[in-house]
Amino acid sequence: MLNRENKTAITRKGMVSNRLNKFSIRKYTVGTASILVGTTLIFGLGNQEAKAAESTNKELNEATTSASDNQSSDKVDMQQLNQEDNTKNDNQKEMVSSQGNETTSNGNKSIEKESVQSTTGNKVEVSTAKSDEQASPKSTNEDLNTKQTISNQEGLQPDLLENKSVVNVQPTNEENKKVDAKTESTTLNVKSDAIKSNAETLVDNNSNSNNENNADIILPKSTAPKSLNTRMRMAAIQPNSTDSKNVNDLITSNTTLTVVDADNSKTIVPAQDYLSLKSQITVDDKVKSGDYFTIKYSDTVQVYGLNPEDIKNIGDIKDPNNGETIATAKHDTANNLITYTFTDYVDRFNSVKMGINYSIYMDADTIPVDKKDVPFSVTIGNQITTTTADITYPAYKEADNNSIGSAFTETVSHVGNVEDPGYYNQVVYVNPMDKDLKGAKLKVEAYHPKYPTNIGQINQNVTNIKIYRVPEGYTLNKGYDVNTNDLVDVTDEFKNKMTYGSNQSVNLDFGDITSAYVVMVNTKFQYTNSESPTLVQMATLSSTGNKSVSTGNALGFTNNQSGGAGQEVYKIGNYVWEDTNKNGVQELGEKGVGNVTVTVFDNNTNTKVGEAVTKEDGSYLIPNLPNGDYRVEFSNLPKGYEVTPSKQGNNEELDSNGLSSVITVNGKDNLSADLGIYKPKYNLGDYVWEDTNKNGIQDQDEKGISGVTVTLKDENGNVLKTVTTDADGKYKFTDLDNGNYKVEFTTPEGYTPTTVTSGSDIEKDSNGLTTTGVINGADNMTLDSGFYKTPKYNLGNYVWEDTNKDGKQDSTEKGISGVTVTLKNENGEVLQTTKTDKDGKYQFTGLENGTYKVEFETPSGYTPTQVGSGTDEGIDSNGTSTTGVIKDKDNDTIDSGFYKPTYNLGDYVWEDTNKNGVQDKDEKGISGVTVTLKDENDKVLKTVTTDENGKYQFTDLNNGTYKVEFETPSGYTPTSVTSGNDTEKDSNGLTTTGVIKDADNMTLDSGFYKTPKYSLGDYVWYDSNKDGKQDSTEKGIKDVKVILLNEKGEVIGTTKTDENGKYRFDNLDSGKYKVIFEKPTGLTQTGTNTTEDDKDADGGEVDVTITDHDDFTLDNGYYEEETSDSDSDSDSDSDSDSDSDSDSDSDSDSDSDSDSDSDSDSDSDSDSDSDSDSDSDSDSDSDSDSDSDSDSDSDSDSDSDSDSDSDSDSDSDSDSDSDSDSDSDSDSDSDSDSDSDSDSDSDSDSDSDSDSDSDSDSDSDSDSDSDSDSDSDSDSDSDSDSDSDSDSDSDSDSDSDSDSDSDSDSDSDSDSDSDSDSDSDSDSDAGKHTPVKPMSTTKDHHNKAKALPETGNENSGSNNATLFGGLFAALGSLLLFGRRKKQNK
């Protein structure tokens, strides 16, 4: 595919997380697609920074010398927009493209997560490596006009190009000469000595750029020009040799090729993962201008995107410091080869090194299915690098037997281009799992409600769809790379099975299928000038008996610009490091410190000019600083760090500048402002001892306790360290910074903590279980804790059945065995659990002093007795939960009593005949109603049915809350709930809650009344005048099929209209329904909703809601389609549009009825003709014969005749006759054109007055008549010409009108005219002097054109119409002429 008009294009096929590229990419996905690439070798954009952009730069400063306006698409990960009933696709991933003058990155990724991830195109970045080597300029003499001098430069230079910014200034003429139309050639005024060389750091730094595609150049280190060598001396007096040669043998590279699992899915998918190519390239000094080297990649690799325009993105290699081109690129895609040809740059510089960082992609075309150990290789120069990967494609989306998959395979978007907005292709696999499906249907739609800026579109004007059947045994390419030569093109079979619908959609009816199909959708983008449009296209497959399944694809695009030119600015930077030995000098093994804030001030104005935060490796860089003195201040040091000594040693790039220092920028970057910090370390600890006398003080004879766990935490409670005490009870935490710490001692088993802080000696007392220790510039060895051995006690008593419910243990009351009793500490933690023995006794042993919680589990079927009865705590009940205290003795007083109560619940179900929700005396119960009792957890306890009196009852119930559910009896409806204020008489509804609290509850009742039924229906009538209203004269249509659907879309009734057009559905409940009228054959739906609801037509499908009433307003009307187009056109006559009114005539098909004149229908139009008459004046008809005079009428006539053209005088010919009829006055009619009002004719009857008689003058008045009236003359002839005459006479149009009406036949009469009228329609054309063609199509109930049977070619049809029209017109004119003669006599 060729690049069209060099427009910026967007494409995608490949998924790479290329960040910091010139064109940011956003991507919303829904499907799987194959991968291609978008990678370039631009080595910087000179003055124009290539940066990741989230938005488009609207304009560049006037000083900008070059700008690039590009569009890129972003990677989108989101939940697949599937609508499976599952409505979401799983795991399919899709890729999006990024595109710019340098790069394009593409890919399909399925919509799985509603999030946006930036994916960028390829950007070139200059290496920031610190190195002792740098490309140096080759010596020249003054004759060569080479004045470039490069000074030595050392130090750290992180992300040099990434952070470069430019102060825009108006470029000089010299600078303008350097500016090319393309952004990559813009010049940057940065000297070559700003770049360092280090191969390893080069590649690493490129990696730090977040997978962007870089091609980096390292310029020479030396600053002094080399002595002139032989080659350069020769260059001064003679041109360089033009012979070019392959110098692959002079190119050395250190290359890695790595498979990247971009989404960490543990599988490698061409549509979403990629290959990372990193290489350091060294150019031998023997290389000269014109020489070239190559990069070749295997056929399993792609390096440009889906967009055929992307091939231009293989860019030249440039020096980012001065914009010079080092090597030009040429891409031979057929042979997988990139050729770089060196410019004279290599003649002027030695030791040229380049570092590249590509993201390249796997070619799905060569990997059609899952495969292990697929080889990928890249050869740079003569050195080949190879890797392998196991390729796994995502599974197709499946639901039951349905399966589907899709991908965008080509996208070219031209933002802002109205004439060519671009196009895209989507491939959909239908039934790729090759199942037998019934009634299969596919819907493809460029619509999703979450993406209103969608620029996709599907409609029959711009969309082309090809459909292929997959042969048996054929394996589809899982990367959606389809070779249609292997498939069977069945597109023609779907011509009548393809329907374009709303929401930019198309539906394909596959019917019953037994094989897979490939659907290829090619369509255009909608025009947009949006900076961030989206493209979303869904595909849904459904079939009989299976869940539908959906997939889709989405892309997002972002427009960006870049460009600029400016004066030279420099950078300040260096390093913050942890000076572990505190000597103030950076040494090996000492690491950088991140997140330190560095602020730069202009030392003269004290103005803040820049700020940065150190990276994880401790480096920082502040750009855009002109020459001057700057104060560098470090702040926000990590907590606990101190500053190392400043200005140690004699190397300012390795010493520490301290928290604040002043440095100078003078014609180059200053990378010497650094800071060393360190952490001082201290100890914390003491002793854990057994305090045998429990006095809280360490006595001489008391010994330490070994093995005690001690935990150290920071102020936020985070555990830092844990130790245990040694044999002497000692513990220590080491290497601690200044700060506050928490120390926690774990109580040894069998011990109790002693009293805290007894006495005045803090080194001898106990600090307790938890204490705080502070380190402030010294060790803290004062935190100790004492414990003593804990004595043990018992707790327990008795659980009994309190039969008399008095809350006290009586001598005759027995214990309850098997009751669960739980012991907890004060914090609610369970310590022990036991059960009562056969006598109801329980006991907990081995307890220390303290407060405990005792909980008794209520035995099944029992209720706790009253608590605390009487004064004897040894025999009362403590309840189900109580507190027990042990203080140096056993506690045997904790007991609990229970008893067994039961109750009843129920009431009444009655028929609420008056629907008032209250039980009235004369209302009776309903028997056989099912009532269900549930507990609070909805567990069914019992079910009963009401007795013959409507009563029900649940017995043997314990206290508690219950749910009661009444089942609605068949044929009944629940009455209103809780009416009135008597809870025993109202209805509690279908579901209610009943509480039993020490008494029966007999208040839960429910009322029902018999459910009323309703009817729905009305009338289907023949709308003869097509006005969409039922007129008294219009009759019903018999045997029209009417279908009734419920709210779920299920057919619940079908009927046909009776002989009067009436239909009716009965026994309907209140609810929502849909009524569908099946259009009678040969009839057309009339206009809908034109008047009051019970008289207008509601259309073929009507939604209706029945709410407690019948609805007899759902009617529909049809009329018979007109066959003669001629009329319709008559508008033309209406030249004056009055004709258009004449359409109304057309309404008056009545004329048409008159068929004979059927043309007369045309008459109706003819009215319009009449207008046309005025046109006729235009005597186009005149052409037609002298009659032409009469043409004015003739027009109408002419119209009448040759419908086709009649107006078109061509018809007029034949019409001419007809004209001739009208001739008589017709001209006057022409006046009548004014009649064009002829709409009045629309009555077409007015036509009957054929003003012609009136001499048309009258017509002119009657204009209304004027129109077709002239025709009417002939009409007059036709039926009761008398009328027509009268009309003519009547001149008074009034008559004419009446006449016209009278027969409307008049039209018919005017058949001759009518013919002409028909022509008149054609006249419309006639006006244009083009013959009118007969209608060749009708419309079915889907408003789709259907071809009428062919009876000959269009010319013959038109000629016949003209011929017959002419004959009728001639006959009419003879009759009229004879009549006039008689009158003259």
Swiss-Prot record:
<feature type="region of interest" description="Disordered">
    <location>
        <begin position="200"/>
        <end position="224"/>
    </location>
</feature>
<dbReference type="InterPro" id="IPR008966">
    <property type="entry name" value="Adhesion_dom_sf"/>
</dbReference>
<feature type="region of interest" description="Ligand binding A region">
    <location>
        <begin position="36"/>
        <end position="568"/>
    </location>
</feature>
<dbReference type="InterPro" id="IPR033764">
    <property type="entry name" value="Sdr_B"/>
</dbReference>
<dbReference type="InterPro" id="IPR011252">
    <property type="entry name" value="Fibrogen-bd_dom1"/>
</dbReference>
<feature type="short sequence motif" description="YSIRK-G/S signaling motif">
    <location>
        <begin position="23"/>
        <end position="34"/>
    </location>
</feature>
<keyword id="KW-0106">Calcium</keyword>
<feature type="compositionally biased region" description="Low complexity">
    <location>
        <begin position="1081"/>
        <end position="1090"/>
    </location>
</feature>
<feature type="modified residue" description="Pentaglycyl murein peptidoglycan amidated threonine">
    <location>
        <position position="1351"/>
    </location>
</feature>
<comment type="subunit">
    <text>Interacts with host DSG1; this interaction increases S.aureus adherence to keratinocytes.</text>
</comment>
<dbReference type="GO" id="GO:0007155">
    <property type="term" value="P:cell adhesion"/>
</dbReference>
<feature type="compositionally biased region" description="Low complexity">
    <location>
        <begin position="205"/>
        <end position="214"/>
    </location>
</feature>
<feature type="compositionally biased region" description="Basic and acidic residues">
    <location>
        <begin position="130"/>
        <end position="145"/>
    </location>
</feature>
<feature type="compositionally biased region" description="Acidic residues">
    <location>
        <begin position="1091"/>
        <end position="1101"/>
    </location>
</feature>
<feature type="region of interest" description="Disordered">
    <location>
        <begin position="54"/>
        <end position="162"/>
    </location>
</feature>
<feature type="compositionally biased region" description="Polar residues">
    <location>
        <begin position="94"/>
        <end position="109"/>
    </location>
</feature>
<dbReference type="InterPro" id="IPR041171">
    <property type="entry name" value="SDR_Ig"/>
</dbReference>
<keyword id="KW-0134">Cell wall</keyword>
<dbReference type="InterPro" id="IPR011266">
    <property type="entry name" value="Adhesin_Fg-bd_dom_2"/>
</dbReference>
<dbReference type="InterPro" id="IPR050972">
    <property type="entry name" value="SDr-like"/>
</dbReference>
<feature type="domain" description="CNA-B 4">
    <location>
        <begin position="902"/>
        <end position="1012"/>
    </location>
</feature>
<dbReference type="GO" id="GO:0005576">
    <property type="term" value="C:extracellular region"/>
</dbReference>
<dbReference type="InterPro" id="IPR019931">
    <property type="entry name" value="LPXTG_anchor"/>
</dbReference>
<feature type="domain" description="CNA-B 1">
    <location>
        <begin position="569"/>
        <end position="680"/>
    </location>
</feature>
<feature type="compositionally biased region" description="Polar residues">
    <location>
        <begin position="972"/>
        <end position="981"/>
    </location>
</feature>
<feature type="region of interest" description="Disordered">
    <location>
        <begin position="1077"/>
        <end position="1361"/>
    </location>
</feature>
<dbReference type="InterPro" id="IPR013783">
    <property type="entry name" value="Ig-like_fold"/>
</dbReference>
<protein>
    <recommendedName>
        <fullName>Serine-aspartate repeat-containing protein D</fullName>
    </recommendedName>
</protein>
<feature type="propeptide" description="Removed by sortase">
    <location>
        <begin position="1352"/>
        <end position="1385"/>
    </location>
</feature>
<dbReference type="Pfam" id="PF00746">
    <property type="entry name" value="Gram_pos_anchor"/>
</dbReference>
<feature type="region of interest" description="Disordered">
    <location>
        <begin position="856"/>
        <end position="886"/>
    </location>
</feature>
<dbReference type="Pfam" id="PF17961">
    <property type="entry name" value="Big_8"/>
</dbReference>
<feature type="compositionally biased region" description="Polar residues">
    <location>
        <begin position="860"/>
        <end position="869"/>
    </location>
</feature>
<feature type="compositionally biased region" description="Acidic residues">
    <location>
        <begin position="1118"/>
        <end position="1324"/>
    </location>
</feature>
<dbReference type="Pfam" id="PF04650">
    <property type="entry name" value="YSIRK_signal"/>
</dbReference>
<feature type="compositionally biased region" description="Polar residues">
    <location>
        <begin position="62"/>
        <end position="71"/>
    </location>
</feature>
<feature type="compositionally biased region" description="Polar residues">
    <location>
        <begin position="146"/>
        <end position="155"/>
    </location>
</feature>
<keyword id="KW-0677">Repeat</keyword>
<dbReference type="InterPro" id="IPR005877">
    <property type="entry name" value="YSIRK_signal_dom"/>
</dbReference>
<dbReference type="Pfam" id="PF10425">
    <property type="entry name" value="SdrG_C_C"/>
</dbReference>
<keyword id="KW-0572">Peptidoglycan-anchor</keyword>
<keyword id="KW-0732">Signal</keyword>
